[in-house]
Amino acid sequence: MSFFENTRKPVGLGGKIMVAMMNFGHSAMAAWGLRFLQPAPDAMVLDCGCGGGANIKTLLKLCPKGKVQGIDYSAVSVEKARKVNADAIAAGRCTVQQASVAELPFEAEQFEVVTAFETVYFWPELAQNFREVYRVLKPGGVFFICNEANGETAKDDKWTQIINGMTIYTDTALKAYLEQAGFCKIQSHKNKKGWLCVTARK
């Protein structure tokens, strides 16, 4: 497995290095995208594909009276995310568990916000996975997607060739999948760097 395969499912030493790099490398994109998300201070939030947990930490600050749960199907990512958010976990404001978006381990209508940073590229069955997100969102809840690639630049093809199982979606494609899952009020935002943020409501 190549080092870049660890972007999909970090494992072993290479995975630990990749997770640490992701926590740092995606911070500017996450900060940009979060301008389009305004969660309530007491919101219940789920971060899907939480990676090394940096975005969980940011979401906990955005929701000082709320709780944030994270899932990732990589054990390496879960371990790192738990370390990064150890204080919040000890305070009962955060949990991180190993799970897949294909079958979210939560009851229906549990979250006001579900986030997905740099992860939908690797979701196995986007239509079904979006329906799972829809299921766990409360009515009126927001699904927030933030990607560093928008499927419209030449460099995007390079990454899909290097990383097996990666699919880069345009905002138009994501909107179609979201509508198919039942979402409405879909909005997309892009910048000159090719970053993409999409929000949708249940």
State where each predicted segment sits:
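Conserved alpha-helix/loop element of class I SAM-dependent methyltransferases that forms part
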Residues: F24-A43, T58
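A short SAM/SAH-binding and catalytic strip from SAM-dependent methyltransferases
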Residues: E112-L126
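A generic alpha-to-beta junction signature in SAM-dependent methyltransferases
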Residues: L37-P39, L62-C63, L137
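Class I SAM-dependent methyltransferase SAM/SAH-binding core
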Residues: M44-E103
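C-terminal alpha-helical "lid/dimerization" subdomain adjacent to the S-adenosyl-L-methionine
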Residues: P10-N23, S27, V142-T199
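Short glycine-dipeptide loop
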Residues: D42, L137-V142
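A short acidic, Gly/Pro-enriched loop at the edge of an enzyme's catalytic core
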Residues: A102-V113
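A short glycine-rich, Lys/Arg-flanked "PGG" loop and its adjoining helix->strand segment in the class I
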Residues: A127-P139
